[in-house]
Amino acid sequence: MMVIRPVERSDVSELMQLASKTGGGLTSLPANEATLSVRIERAIKTWQGELPKSEQGYVFVLEDSETGTVAGICAIEVAVGLNDPWYNYRVGTLVHASKELNVYNALPTLFLSNDHTGSSELCTLFLDPEWRKEGNGYLLSKSRFMFMAAFRDKFNDKVVAEMRGVIDEHGYSPFWQSLGKRFFSMDFSRADFLCGTGQKAFIAELMPKHPIYTHFLSQEAQDVIGQVHPQTAPARAVLEKEGFRYRNYIDIFDGGPTLECDIDRVRAIRKSRLVEVAEGQPAQGDFPACLVANENYHHFRVVLVRTDPATERLILTAAQLDALKCHAGDRVRLVRLCAEEKTA
């Protein structure tokens, strides 16, 4: 059975294996054991209440409960940009016009922005390609909404998610090649590694401070502004079905889109509800896949089950209860997947 749980120190070796499969561009999951260990430790201290809000971040893993294999990772940053500036570009417009010459040009322009400072961030979503089946991607991505719904006071009113931009299998980023490399004088992979290992001072020191006309970029770079890596397209679709939208903010490195949504308007958060759980044999029928989560902050668990999403009393097997760290009579959080999201 596939289960979402909080990250543990012993997960570092399996997370290293996951990091080696990302293909680059996933800044928050570098193939660097020391950095991953620090990230795990920060998550543990967040759960223990030892960190200020500006440093808090939760990390979860998707585990096969039968084998202990870690198949995926996802995370939430509580409030971005309160320690180090959180940069992106806002894609806006500058108008150059002359009535005398009868000239009017509206030019797409990139403006350096810190507009999302303080927002909660969905990040570090990666599922091992071998496990991209049977609804695992939905479970991994949406489990975070179940945690946010249960512990709403831990998070801010706006949630953002940076989507990985267009990068090829060799680490070539058209957006970086045309813009970032001119200011940072390094390859994309180097900048990505430095950022992923926490060495972010160079961003503020070297990045352009003035608006940039996108027409000055290569056509290839212009074409990928706000576009996602092919492997990230499903993750974008999942978030958009939950209510997230692209509001013309992009990543400063690869030009990938930043999606955003008010936390209380996220579908899974808004529609999830608490029901009593009982042990037994679930009724047979053509029921939709639903997320089920416990309400245990320190031992949070989420699984995917097929059940009636309108039920007031959820029947689970002993194995499902054990996976959720629940007992009969406990209350669990329940919400169905979107109707078009299939798990088989």
From Swiss-Prot:
Annotated EC: 2.3.1.109
Binding site for succinyl-CoA: L125
HAMAP family cross-referenced by the UniProt entry: AstA
PANTHER family to which the protein is assigned, alphabetical: ARGININE N-SUCCINYLTRANSFERASE (PTHR30420:SF1), N-SUCCINYLARGININE DIHYDROLASE (PTHR30420)
Annotated keywords: Acyltransferase, Arginine metabolism, Transferase
Protein name, as recorded: Arginine N-succinyltransferase
Pathway entry: Amino-acid degradation; L-arginine degradation via AST pathway; L-glutamate and succinate from L-arginine: step 1/5
Function recorded in the entry: Catalyzes the transfer of succinyl-CoA to arginine to produce N(2)-succinylarginine.
Molecular-function GO terms, alphabetical: arginine N-succinyltransferase activity
Enzyme class: transferase
